[in-house]
Structure formats: structure tokens, C-alpha cells
A protein has these predicted regions:
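Short S/T/G/P-rich N-terminal loop/turn motif that feeds into the first structured element of a domain
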Residues: 1-69, 75-86
Length: 86
């Protein structure tokens, strides 16, 4: 895993999870090789992923559709790059 996204949101975790699954099925699956989604609580999650194309990920996250979804659902993402030690 090389990316960690910590998200807070006003919608429920189930709504966020459905959105992530929809995104993976409709295009993001082309650049996400593997992932884990963890529910911290009803309004916070941690998404760990192995991303193979950071440019494509950035384009998706900054698309008008994604920005609208984030705004409508009060979603704020903090994205971290990870590097395996040892």
C-alpha cells in the first residue's frame, strides 16, 4: 500500500463506502491495484490503497463531479504517501 486517505464526512459511512465502490467499478479500478477501507466511526474512514497512476488519481479527486460530491457530503480528505520501511 502506498497511499493513505483519511476522510471525514457528514454522510454515513455506508454512503461513502458505496461511493468508493462505485468509483472503483467505473474507472478508479484502473489505477487502484489493491485497497482496504476501514470505518473509524460513522463519519470518519481510512482508505489504504496501492495506486499505480498518481496522475489519474489526482485527476479523479479533482474532477468537478468529485468536488461536487465532496461538497454535498461534507467530505474532507487528507492524503498521505506511504513508503515501506525495511
Amino acid at each position: 500500500m502506498n497511499v493513505c486517505v483519511v476522510s471525514t464526512f457528514k454522510c454515513t459511512f455506508d454512503v461513502l463506502e458505496a461511493k468508493i465502490k462505485e468509483d472503483l467499478a467505473s474507472g478508479a479500478g484502473a489505477f487502484v491495484a489493491d485497497y482496504e477501507l476501514v470505518k473509524v466511526n460513522d463519519h470518519k474512514s481510512i482508505f489504504m490503497a496501492h495506486v499505480t497512476d498518481f496522475e489519474a488519481m489526482g485527476a479523479m479527486m479533482n474532477s468537478p463531479e468529485m468536488k461536487k460530491w465532496d461538497e454535498d457530503n461534507g467530505c474532507v480528505d487528507s492524503v498521505y504517501m506511504l513508503e515501506k520501511m525495511g
